[in-house]
Regions:
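A glycine-rich, acidic short-motif signal
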Residues: 1-192
Length: 192
């Protein structure tokens, strides 16, 4: 599509400054779509590997928030992670991480899942990359925000967390670990 647009308009679309890729959640369940997406990203098309990938149940609802916002939606979303002191490393939420984990069977991809609160996008959960039960295919599985924090702590992507758990407050900071995590039916498993 990008190449056809370039040929039709006689101009080259520069995608190197794209900060965010927003994916519809249902696409994550489509193995063929995901395979095509990572193949495009790996084929030399100028899609920046460092763009942050967000997931939404309703991409249109998130995109339509731009009308009410004072700043660019893409910048707002990128800053939501990059400017957040809880995140030491956003590399697990990048397009490059998604591609690498898809091909190599890795499990470092942690994609934020967006919802809407007070007419602003908010992270309401995460999608974790994992290998399916057959051991052959990569899948992305949604977990709660709290489970995503645990996975982020285990991966080193999150360095500080403040959250409510069972009516109490937990504050963790300067966490350094070696890790391996998996999404399970009952939550997130983390081997430290």
């Amino acid at each position: 599509v990008i190449r056809r647009m370039d040929e039709k308009n006689g101009k080259i679309l520069d995608l190197n400054h794209v900060k965010v890729l927003l994916l519809e959640a249902e696409f994550l369940e489509e193995k063929d779509f995901m395979q095509e997406l990572v193949e495009i990203g790996n084929s030399g098309v100028d899609l920046p590997g460092n763009m942050i990938v967000f997931v939404a149940e309703d991409v249109d609802a998130i995109s339509n928030l731009q009308e009410e916002m004072d700043e660019d939606l893409g910048n707002y979303l990128a800053e939501m992670l990059e400017g957040n002191p809880n995140y030491e490393d956003t590399s697990g939420a990048t397009f490059k991480s998604l591609i690498c984990d898809w091909y190599n069977g890795g499990s470092s991809t942690i994609l934020p899942s967006l919802g809407v609160q007070d007419d602003l996008p908010v992270v309401e959960g995460y999608y974790l990359m994992q290998t399916d039960v057959s051991g052959d295919d990569q899948i992305l599985r949604k977990v709660t925000a709290e489970e995503g924090y645990v996975a982020g702590l285990c991966s080193g992507a999150i360095g500080m967390v403040d959250m409510d758990v069972d009516g109490g407050q937990i504050h963790l900071e300067n966490v350094k670990v070696s890790y391996e995590y998996t999404a399970t039916n009952s939550g997130v498993g983390c081997q430290l």
